[in-house]
Amino acid sequence: MLALLPTPLWPAGVISLFEGEMADRPEGGVKAHKRFVLLVVAILTVFFTAPSHAFELAPFKDHLFAYPRILQQSEGGDYRVVDYQEMRDINGRDAVPERRVQGRYVSTEIRRLQRDLAIRTSAGNIRHFAVGATENARVITVYLHGQGGNRHQGVNDFTFGGNFNRIKNLMGRNGGLYLSPDFSDFAERGAREITALVAYYAARSPQAPIFIACGSMGGALCWRLAMSGPFAGRIGGLLLLGSFWDDSFLNSPAFHNRVPVFFGHGSHDSVFPVEKQEAFFRAIGEKAPGYPARFVRFETGTHGTPIRMTDWRDTLNWMLSRRP
């Protein structure tokens, strides 16, 4: 399918979109079709009944994904220490630890709204999964993987405790769009590719706030995107999940726009020490009192814990209420 696309925000050079083979298709059958119809009805109900000025994501399995006990909080609740226990939150949650979550944590009907796509741009072909409304989305969430990852990681329904399945459902059921792309690197080329990808979908959903979630080394792209003036104007929030700090953010367009920032970090992260990320979080508040920043420390959690344990709905609804 060929389409010349307007790119009013960024010179992304997008010229076309083509569809690839969709991974992990759900089983067919009458029951699956009926469940899908109910899913579509639920999406339309949310889309047409929720007032835009009060838009927030409707619940999805909140009782399973809400944070466990809060051990400590300060900064008016913007800094929290969450009780994380490996035996409970991995072994007690997964059917096969770290490989397959128990079935009650997921709903694979959302796969009916999932496509494996690519766009051709001046930055190259960008492969990505898109879940939900590719036009007129109410909200867009983009997940950028870390070192060694790929676009498949962000749509795997069963790893990381089913948390990727939850964000897919939260977007799809609320008239939103979820994107999980491939990209070449964590430097300038990768940033150009993600800018082109987001420009493509932003042109089709001009009212949608765009949330960028960056896992581990993917944070390098979060910080690069924050430095882009035109891009920063569309960012609804940045999520740093087991990632690192960048002092240049304090002088970025996104910072001056007071774009909400969420940090999720394990206290036993051996890749990026939690103390340095906490210090950066506090530096934001010191430079700009009242800045919309949150930090969730998962006590005893490790490098990958925030991807498993971050409460997507709680975080994104907070950002929706605080975005510029």
Locate each region found by the language model.
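Alpha/beta-hydrolase active-site loop
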Residues: 184-205
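Short, surface-exposed "cap/lid" segments of acyl-processing enzymes
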Residues: 122-166, 170
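N-terminal cap/lid segment of alpha/beta-hydrolase-fold proteins
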Residues: 81-134
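C-terminal catalytic histidine-bearing segment of alpha/beta-hydrolase fold enzymes
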Residues: 290-324
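N-terminal signal peptide c-region/cleavage motif recognized by signal peptidases
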Residues: 49-51
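Short alpha-helix in the alpha/beta-hydrolase fold that links the catalytic acid
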Residues: 273-283
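Short beta-strand/loop motif that positions the catalytic acidic residue
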Residues: 262-265, 269
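Primarily recognizes the serine-hydrolase "nucleophile elbow" in alpha/beta-hydrolase
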Residues: 209-257
